[in-house]
Amino acid sequence: MDDGCNSLESLIKYYPYFKDNESVQKFIIPIQPQFHEDLFPDFSNMKGSLFEKDQSLYSCQGNTIKKAYLCHSKIKTIRKGDIILFYRSKDRKSIQCMGIVEDVLFSENIDEVFPAIAKRTVYKYSDIQNILKKRTLVILFRYKALDKEISRQQIAKAEIKGNIQSIRQLSN
């Protein structure tokens, strides 16, 4: 799929397919189970349970392709078109979904951040205000579920050592 488009343009044009070559940086982002459940409800522990079809338990933003991730990481190398892999920490210790970065910003300003993430996040306005009490990394991305989960054992075989506790850039 080398059509002259960058990875973000390719994703938009060919979704669910995406570009992955040497020019595309990759990052692994740890995410705690409760936040993973909110951001990616299709991987919820409720799936297959009695309450799976109870839509009141899920926010509409959780069921979108366009999403936002907020954190206090100081990493500054993530850019538009990069691939981000979400590592569900603590319970599953695996990667089940990924995203292609649409935009990145650092801010403490609710007037700048809220319009950018309002329809992409599961957070309430008051939650966002609390998060923004210090400089926040905001990653806007397009979500893609992986066909197959990547286990912690597979991650270790890929030379990703140690506990995954902060955003890490991966080598190609």
Protein language model features and the residues they cover:
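Contiguous surface segments at macromolecular interaction interfaces
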Residues: 1-49, 107-172
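Short gly/pro-enriched beta-turn/loop segments at secondary-structure junctions
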Residues: 22-24, 79-81, 94
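Short coil-to-beta transition motif at edge beta-strands of beta-rich domains
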Residues: 74-88
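Short, flexible beta-strand-to-coil junctions
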Residues: 88-92, 144-145
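Short catalytic/ligand-binding loop motif for oxyanion handling, primarily in non-cytosolic enzymes
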Residues: 93-95, 149
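Short beta-strand-centered aromatic/proline hotspots
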Residues: 95-105
